[in-house]
């Protein structure tokens, strides 16, 4: 009889893929099977995020709840970025935790499960060529890591301290994984990296003469691959070659995440982002011109230390010019180990909240206009999900979530849908037979 695994994943798509790797390792090597019922689990894992303070607080509230809900003899493990930066502190604050496994140490999961009070948080551990077992949360798409770690050292970001330096995964391994996924029915390939379009700058073994644009072309040539998505690219590496391949390759989905963070060049310099307001606008507006149907999402931090009212207005100006389809916006959150946490000119919470509210309110107005403009458009939709309220949903080529009436027979297929009732979260439509 197999043992039961309950796993909760917080944070980014990289964490989702790490959790898939953990599930594969434990199911194939330790005979675990997944359960959604925490009370029957023999092993309870939480894969954590530490980009902001809130997910760190959530970790300790969640593991406390796990301890109360778990059955006798069940183990609790903490994985991911918070595990990397807190390490043994987790044992002190939650002594009922059985092991701590950092984000760069996923391949050690079987050892962790079988070793009392195991801890491994080595951010220099190299997993770029480790052959993980295969598990996909969805049969219709496959998340695939193309690099690990981050070299950028942005002053507000803890990720380089939890995931280590950037290493590209050999292209031969990536292509084999894509081929395997496509043969098993995954028509959409989702490429992952902290700076995904910096791919090819450094390998741990044999160096390759390849960049991200080249890799995209190679993946698009694999039989069975119909759609390619990726996250998260860095604006600094969006050269003309990259934009041209993105625009002209018919298998690359026309949605681009462009993390702005701030629209002010001085603030960007303090953040160590490596680009200016002018560079960002040039890339974004050129992309809009080259690819009119593209949807652009972004990340924005308001109230970074020292940000003046006028500097915040530059962020609002970029919002007006680019008109992002989606924004992920936050008040600046000081993170341990980061340079910005030591800056003396921190912004008070009242000012930060006012700026965030203004930004989000204006984007809501822009989004309403964007959504309304989708009425009567016809999209090719790749259906992946049965909805609780009936019908099936999937993504358009430019990343709108579309729902139509239909059954599970539509899952894993691409169909044309005409938008009849566009809403912010979902565009409701009708199949075009």
UniProtKB/Swiss-Prot annotation:
One cellular component (GO) term of this entry: cytosol
E.C. number(s) listed in UniProt: 2.8.4.3
Protein's name in the database: tRNA-2-methylthio-N(6)-dimethylallyladenosine synthase
Subcellular location(s) of the protein: Cytoplasm
Enzyme class: transferase
InterPro entries listed in its UniProt record: Elp3/MiaA/NifB-like_rSAM (IPR006638), Methylthiotransferase (IPR005839), Methylthiotransferase_CS (IPR020612), Methylthiotransferase_N (IPR013848), Methylthiotransferase_N_sf (IPR038135), MiaB_methiolase (IPR006463), rSAM (IPR007197), rSAM_horseshoe (IPR023404)
A GO molecular-function descriptor: N6-isopentenyladenosine methylthiotransferase activity
Main subcellular location: cytoplasm
Organism of this sequence: Campylobacter concisus (strain 13826)
Name of one Pfam family that matches: UPF0004
Co-factor: note: Binds 2 [4Fe-4S] clusters. One cluster is coordinated with 3 cysteines and an exchangeable S-adenosyl-L-methionine.
Gene: miaB
């Amino acid at each position: 009889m197999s043992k039961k695994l309950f796993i909760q994943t917080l944070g980014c798509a990289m964490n989702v893929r790490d959790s898939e790797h953990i599930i594969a390792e434990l199911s194939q090597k330790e005979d675990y099977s997944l359960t959604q019922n925490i009370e029957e689990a023999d092993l309870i894992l939480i894969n954590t995020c530490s980009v902001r303070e809130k997910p760190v607080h959530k970790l300790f509230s969640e593991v406390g709840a796990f301890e109360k809900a778990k059955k006798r003899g069940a183990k609790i493990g903490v994985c991911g970025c918070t595990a990397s930066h807190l390490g043994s502190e987790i044992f002190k604050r939650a002594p009922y935790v059985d092991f701590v496994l950092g984000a760069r140490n996923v391949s050690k999961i079987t050892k962790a499960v079988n070793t009392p009070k195991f801890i491994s948080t080595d951010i220099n551990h190299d997993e770029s060529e480790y052959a993980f077992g295969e598990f996909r949360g969805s049969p219709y798409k496959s998340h695939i890591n193309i690099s690990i770690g981050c070299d950028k050292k942005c002053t507000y970001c803890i990720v380089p301290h939890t995931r280590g330096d950037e290493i590209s995964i050999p292209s031969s391994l990536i292509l084999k994984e894509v081929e395997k996924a496509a043969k098993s029915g995954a028509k959409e390939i989702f490429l992952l990296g902290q700076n995904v379009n910096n791919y090819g700058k450094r390998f741990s073994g044999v160096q390759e003469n390849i960049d991200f644009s080249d890799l995209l072309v190679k993946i698009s040539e694999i039989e069975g691959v119909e759609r390619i998505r990726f996250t998260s690219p860095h604006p600094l590496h969006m050269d003309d070659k990259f934009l041209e391949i993105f625009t002209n390759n018919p298998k690359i989905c026309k949605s681009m995440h462009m993390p702005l963070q701030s629209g002010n060049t001085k603030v960007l310099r303090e953040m160590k982002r490596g680009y200016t307001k002018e560079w960002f606008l040039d890339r974004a507006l050129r992309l809009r011109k080259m690819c009119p149907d593209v949807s652009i999402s972004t990340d924005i931090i308001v109230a970074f230390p020292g940000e003046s009212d006028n500097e915040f207005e530059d962020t609002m100006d970029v919002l007006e010019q680019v008109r992002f389809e989606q924004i992920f916006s936050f008040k600046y959150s000081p993170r341990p180990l980061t340079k910005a946490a030591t800056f003396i000119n921190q912004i008070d919470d009242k000012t930060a909240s006012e700026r965030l509210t203004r930004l989000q309110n204006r984007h809501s107005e822009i989004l309403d206009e964007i959504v309304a403009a989708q009425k009567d458009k016809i999209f090719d939709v790749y259906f992946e999900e049965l909805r609780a309220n009936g019908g099936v949903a999937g993504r358009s080529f430019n990343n709108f979530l579309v729902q139509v009436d239909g059954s599970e027979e539509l899952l894993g297929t691409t169909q044309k849908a005409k938008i009849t009732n566009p809403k912010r979260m979902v565009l409701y439509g009708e199949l075009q037979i």
